[in-house]
Amino acid sequence: MIDITTDDRVIAEVAFPAALTELHEKAIYLHEAKQFQVERMDYDGRKAYVRRVECDYYTDAIDYTQVKILEQFDGRPLAGAEAAHGEVRVNRQIVGFKKVKFYTNENIGAGMLSLPEQEMHTTSYWLHFPAEFLEQFTGLTPTERLNALAGLGSAFRTVASLLLMCDPRDLGVALTEQISVEVRGFEPNLHIYDNFPGGIGQSAPLYGLTAELIAGARALISQCACESGCPGCTGPAGETGERGKQSALEILNVLTGAGEPLQPTPF
């Protein structure tokens, strides 16, 4: 990353996968408590040219991600769903970004991007939701079911990073549809994958912590003081819908066993 505010000076190095989401053109990047805006990204040269700015918002990249399961190492049933882990191929493209205001998390703008698609082989933990599992939530529309699963992904990422004691950016989250001749209807997979080529050994331990992950997400969401979702639990309500938080809790209640008492959580 090169600061062009006064002179062309290298001020930081960022891993390439992270640079695509954090150093795209017009991104706001925080370095040593100072804000920088990316003026230009040299994709081939692996350089980002930034200028010092002061603004009241940050940027959040919008990506389109597909995950294909290459090999399942292990799996087990989970209250009508299935938990598993294995090797996957992740295809990801950054297609835009949002401007989010500090403190209020208000979306104050957006922009389009067209970065090349990236392919990565890594390892992933996932939950598979058969059509029969989702159909039991008769009070939810198909869109609300999708929003609920997206909200779960946000909560799972937070809890997983605490359980694994890693940076949340070390984990990628993607909601994809499982397609095969055996599958009939919409049967999504919610992936939490290692955000590094080849994986860094997070998926197998997370698979072993499935019960803690589910219980932790349920406690996190239910104990959050927000009304309809926030970045601290299921994500902003504008992204998961007005019922996204409650719908996510309904799914977690089934996964954990409805009526089980909530246990205190340290986060």
Residue positions per predicted region:
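Extended, highly charged accessory segments
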Residues: M1-L23, A27-A33, E39-F267
